[in-house]
């Protein structure tokens, strides 16, 4: 079995910051090492628009660390950054609610349908590596 393109997606876990960073760094290092051995020609990773501006969040620090590993590797790559998915809105609202109080984020939110992101990732994966970041919003 051989692969010319690898897609990665990491789910946000409700875990401590250290665990998230460690998971994304370890899994990304392992994946990149195996891709190098296999001669993979295109690593595609899904990330979030604004990651570099939200480093006070452990999740976004972890995503930034993941992106840095990818950009620092020898594997040609495309990082696809998207806004949060419409499908996550209920979970975000539930997480932000305590009793009858809702904490509103200071960040702007511009959700996108997961299907639209999947289509964009597919198009990018089938193309040549951009060795950079593509934003889908």
Where are these regions (language model features)?
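Active-site beta-alpha turn of Rossmann-fold NAD(P)-dependent dehydrogenases/reductases
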Residues: 7, 44-47, 81-83
